A protein has these predicted regions:
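Conserved PLP-enzyme active-site core in the AAT-like
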Residues: 1-170, 175-191, 199-216
């Protein structure tokens, strides 16, 4: 069996909207594929699109969704949802064979109750997205180019190599993505305004002096 797998939201923080998902569904049908959605940050996509989860999953033809928990407030554990029940046959056995079956599985599953009750999962995602937008706006005001649209909780900031090095010396930890100088900055459910302001202050302290030095 062949399958198409997409990530929602994507690795660069963008979100597949309903029209794009419709187009993907047409291709999936044309080539007789199963459709898997990697939803490690699915909550962030739903928070951005402001639609019911069904609108971007089974109603668009998605067969299997991996719903992320660890990137939205949980200590451990993601959830696999089979909209196509046939694909879920013997899934428990496959989990066991892959080493994904814990002896106290209920302790991994129980936190989902708290995360899904009263839309906590969406509140967490909305907060993370909001912090990301605040950070992106602040960086743009400093003249830092944002390399990809900020549609979830990820910001890809095009710092220079010098700026990247100085930020790390100041204690900020981040990955460089798609080449040197593009910092992958992630905001979470627990990112605070104070943390954003502190990072922006550090960025301002290095962006302006380096820019002045280059002008001279």
């Amino acid at each position: 069996a062949k399958a198409l797998s997409i990530t929602q939201s994507t690795e660069v923080g963008t979100v597949y909207d309903l029209d794009v998902l419709d187009g993907i569904h047409e291709s999936v049908q044309r080539f007789d594929l199963s459709w898997h959605m990697d939803g490690a940050r699915f909550a962030n996509a739903i928070a951005t699109l402001d639609v019911a989860p069904k609108e971007v999953t089974w109603k668009r033809g998605v067969d299997v969704l991996c719903l992320g928990g660890t990137k939205n407030g949980m200590a451990v554990g993601d959830c696999v949802v089979f909209f196509n029940r046939d694909l879920g046959k013997e899934f428990e056995y496959r989990c066991k064979q892959a080493g994904q079956l814990a002896s106290k599985m209920r302790f991994l599953a129980a936190p989902w109750v708290g995360l899904l009750t009263d839309d906590v999962w969406l509140q967490n995602a909305r907060h993370a997205n909001g912090m990301a937008n605040k950070l992106a706006q602040g960086l743009q005001q400093l003249g830092v180019r944002i390399a990809a649209p900020v549609e979830s909780n990820a910001i890809f900031a095009a710092f220079t190599s010098e700026q990247t090095n100085v930020l790390r010396e100041l204690g900020w930890i981040f990955y460089e993505f798609s080449g040197v100088g593009t910092a992958r900055l992630m905001c979470s459910w627990k990112t605070t305004d104070a943390e954003i302001e502190r990072l922006l202050a550090d960025c301002e302290s290095i962006v302006t002096p380096l820019a002045q030095a280059q002008d001279n």
